[in-house]
């Protein structure tokens, strides 16, 4: 009885010490695979993606896939679409998302407008700026930044 108690206590002590140690560092491919799986199942701003991106950023701070993932996450998280009533048949180059009739049988147009949370948008821009700094010859990163800025400014191109 005493031997089995000691064996059980020893087993628990070894188990807890193993849990207390940091898990081994994942490779870039493992992070990328996990990120792709989460985005595929939960969308670009799903639960757990921010935590994964933070861990990935600590282990590989200049990884392009991680930086683009952060940009996508924070940009998606910052975007808040809403319907607004506007005069005219087009707004910022877009057709109305919804058209209703008022009491005088006139068309009332509603357009989808994306508003952005300033802090989350700033984090997205910081991520894409870091990606541009790491790989200045990648034009796609510059185009992502330009598109995000145009969207946030609500200017018709």
Segments (PLM) and residue ranges:
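Conserved structural position within tetratricopeptide repeats
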Residues: 40, 55-59, 126-133
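Bacterial Sec-dependent N-terminal signal peptides
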Residues: 1-28
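Residue-level recognition of tetratricopeptide repeat
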Residues: 63-66, 136-141
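Short coil/linker segments at helix-helix boundaries
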Residues: 29, 73-130, 134-137, 144, ...
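Structural register within alpha-helical repeat arrays
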Residues: 34-38, 56, 70, 77, ...
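Sec-dependent signal peptide cleavage junction
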Residues: 18-50, 57, 83-98
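Repeat-mediated protein-protein interaction surfaces in helical alpha-solenoids
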Residues: 46-54, 122-129
């Amino acid at each position: 009885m005493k031997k089995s108690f000691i064996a059980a206590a020893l087993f628990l002590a070894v188990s807890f010490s193993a849990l207390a140690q940091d898990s081994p560092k994942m490779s870039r491919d493992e992070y990328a695979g996990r990120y792709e799986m989460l985005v595929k199942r939960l969308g670009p701003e799903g639960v757990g993606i921010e935590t994964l991106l933070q861990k990935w950023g600590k282990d590989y701070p200049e990884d392009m896939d991680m930086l683009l993932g952060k940009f996508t996450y924070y940009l998606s998280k910052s975007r808040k679409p809403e319907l607004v009533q506007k005069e005219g048949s087009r707004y910022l180059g877009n057709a109305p998302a919804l058209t209703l009739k008022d009491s005088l049988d006139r068309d009332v147009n509603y357009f989808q407008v994306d508003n952005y949370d300033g802090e989350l948008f700033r984090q997205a821009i910081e991520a894409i700026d870091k990606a541009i700094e790491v790989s200045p010859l990648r034009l796609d990163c510059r185009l992502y930044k330009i598109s995000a800025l145009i969207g946030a400014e609500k200017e018709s191109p």
